[in-house]
C-alpha cells in the first residue's frame, strides 16, 4: 500500500485529516462516504478541492481521507491541508504554487479558552451603574 499511495496529514482547529492519494479517476472518499454525502455544504466541498483545482489534478487522483474531530468547516480545512501535503509528497514541484496560494501553511488559529469571571473568552459581565 505504501508504494503506490502518497499521504499527508492536515490539521485545522481541532480536526485532523489523514489523506491518501493515488492515480485514479478523481473520486474522493471521506470516512468511507463520498465527499458529496459527507459534507452538507457546497463550500466545504469547494474548500477541500482547492489544491486539486489549483494544480489541475481534479480528475487525476483517487483520494481516501480519514478525518476526525471538530466540525464541518474545520474538517474541510484539515482535508485541504492534508491533500496539499499529499500532493507535495507526490510531486515537490507543486509546492511553490500551493505555497503561493497559502495552502501549505497550517492555519494556527484555535478557539480561545473561556476565562473565569467572564461570560466567554473576552465578553465581560454586563456593567450596572446602579
From Swiss-Prot:
Keywords: Ribonucleoprotein, Ribosomal protein
GO molecular function, a single term: RNA binding
GO cellular component, one term: cytosolic small ribosomal subunit
A Pfam cross-reference name: Ribosomal_S9
GO BP of this protein: translation
Ribonucleoprotein found in the keyword field: yes
Family classification: Belongs to the universal ribosomal protein uS9 family.
The name this protein goes by in its record: Small ribosomal subunit protein uS9
Amino acid at each position: 500500500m505504501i508504494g503506490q499511495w502518497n499521504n499527508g496529514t492536515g490539521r485545522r482547529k481541532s480536526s485532523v485529516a489523514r489523506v491518501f492519494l493515488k492515480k485514479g479517476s478523481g473520486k474522493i472518499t471521506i470516512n468511507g462516504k463520498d465527499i458529496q454525502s459527507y459534507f452538507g455544504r457546497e463550500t466545504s466541498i469547494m474548500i477541500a478541492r482547492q489544491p486539486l483545482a489549483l494544480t489541475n489534478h481534479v480528475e487525476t487522483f483517487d483520494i481516501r481521507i480519514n478525518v476526525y474531530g471538530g466540525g464541518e468547516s474545520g474538517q474541510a480545512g484539515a482535508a485541504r491541508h492534508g491533500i496539499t501535503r499529499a500532493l507535495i509528497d507526490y510531486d515537490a514541484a507543486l509546492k511553490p504554487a500551493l505555497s503561493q496560494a497559502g495552502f501549505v501553511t497550517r492555519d494556527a488559529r484555535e478557539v480561545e479558552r473561556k476565562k473565569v469571571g467572564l461570560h466567554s473568552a473576552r465578553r465581560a459581565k454586563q456593567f450596572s451603574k446602579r
